[in-house]
Amino acid sequence: MESLDEIQWKSPEFIQERGLNTNNVLEYFSLSPFYDRTSNNQVLMMQFQYQQIQIPPGVSFHQYFQSRLSEMTGIEFVIAYTKEPDFWIIRKQKRQDPQNTVTLQDYYIIGANVYQAPRIYDVLSSRLLASVLSIKNSTDLLNDMTSYHISDGGHSYINSIHGSSSKPSQSSAVSKPSSTNTGTNATTTPITLTTPSGATVPSTVSNGISTSTEIASGVFDTLLNDVVMNDDHLYIDEIPLYGEGSTLERLGLKGNKDAGLSL
């Protein structure tokens, strides 16, 4: 069975034949599925059909009808609010005595359509659920907009909504070596290594920037021993780069001070 709070009901035939006003709105409501046929309203309507009633002068039918309902106890439907020509609120309540009632449900009529008013619990539940879903979607969006890279030193944010992306790690990784190479080019002096006859010294030279030479480990050991065991306590900073007793001579390399080193 369909829930009553999801139903919209109307009767075009009744509206076309009799119209809709405050005097007959309860009768119109009694045709809807929201109406309780065991209510006091149904009892009075059955009595009015078979009994002749006299309405006091200056009293409308719905006022007289509701005054009769106040004399009874049980379930009843009354007009709680009126805003003619197209809005009424019908209230279902349980009357305990002429002065005390307990509200059970409200219904409202807009134009010719009858609706069941939602409960406060349902309204709050719906609003809270919508709020939680919105917060969840926002959190997911924030998670999609951030990424963590060790090279960046933390989180970076990307505006994925507009499809733009930034790669600071790559740009910085490219720019830093270029600046380092620039400084190296400005201060490095090209060196050409010279290998003495009978010696084999593999080397790799790239554009005059960096030089890597493989020399037998025994040569370095000899040089280190000469420095450490020297009776004059000479430090390595005092050994000349070129000439007699120089580092190049101890390594078994020949060099020209003006032109550099050569194999």
Curated annotation (Swiss-Prot):
Stretch list, region Disordered: 159-205
Q: Where are the transmembrane segments?
A: none
**InterPro entries listed in its UniProt record:** Mediator_Med6 (IPR007018), Mediator_Med6_fun (IPR016612), Mediator_Med6_sf (IPR038566)
UniProt-annotated location(s): Nucleus
Q: Has the keyword Isomerase been applied to this entry?
A: no
Q: Which terms under GO biological process does the entry name?
A: regulation of transcription by RNA polymerase II
Any one GO CC term of this protein is:
core mediator complex
Which domain of life does this protein belong to? Eukaryota
Q: Which Pfam families match?
A: Med6
Main location group: nucleus
Record keywords: Activator, Nucleus, Transcription, Transcription regulation
- A Gene Ontology molecular function term of the record: transcription coactivator activity
- Regions of compositional bias (Low complexity) in chain numbering: 164-200
Record's subunit section: Component of the Mediator complex.
What the record says about family reads: Belongs to the Mediator complex subunit 6 family.
Q: Its biological function?
A: Component of the Mediator complex, a coactivator involved in the regulated transcription of nearly all RNA polymerase II-dependent genes. Mediator functions as a bridge to convey information from gene-specific regulatory proteins to the basal RNA polymerase II transcription machinery. Mediator is recruited to promoters by direct interactions with regulatory proteins and serves as a scaffold for the assembly of a functional preinitiation complex with RNA polymerase II and the general transcription factors.
What protein is this chain from? Mediator of RNA polymerase II transcription subunit 6
Species of the source? Candida albicans (strain SC5314 / ATCC MYA-2876) (Yeast)
